[in-house]
Amino acid sequence: MKKYNKSIGFYGEDLSAKFLKKEGYSILEKNFNCSSGEIDIIAIKDEIISFIEVKSRFSNSFGNPKESVTCSKQGRIINAAKYYLHVKKLYNYYIRFDVIEVNFHIDSSKYELNFLKDAFRV
């Protein structure tokens, strides 16, 4: 089941990246990892760097996807973002923390994508 969930997650991230590109974002990184944590997508548009957590689900039986971005998860994303900005020397940008929810339909290939800008703050 874990491997299946991981492949659903990667598919959701790919769909999210395509959506962001259509919306005029440039993708800076996908699956950025450091000792502080992981960021699914880092994108930029209009001088705003967005650190994006993608949550993909077939069902809301465990709550909606955004609810799984807990305070501790937010902290790890924030710390990873600080590290990324420092390493890349990106100091003169606005930043934002977003969540993209991808809800797949079990009985078809359809999905719903919900882009939650400024989902949490430092």
Curated annotation (Swiss-Prot):
It holds the Pfam family UPF0102. InterPro entries: Restrct_endonuc-II-like (IPR011335), tRNA_endonuc-like_dom_sf (IPR011856), UPF0102_YraN-like (IPR003509). Disulfide bonds: none annotated. Gene3D superfamilies: 3.40.1350.10. SUPFAM superfamilies: Restriction endonuclease-like (SSF52980). GO terms for molecular function: nucleic acid binding. Belongs to the UPF0102 family. PANTHER family: UPF0102 PROTEIN YRAN. NCBIfam families: PRK12497.1-3, YraN family protein. This is UPF0102 protein CPF_1959. It comes from Clostridium perfringens (strain ATCC 13124 / DSM 756 / JCM 1290 / NCIMB 6125 / NCTC 8237 / Type A).
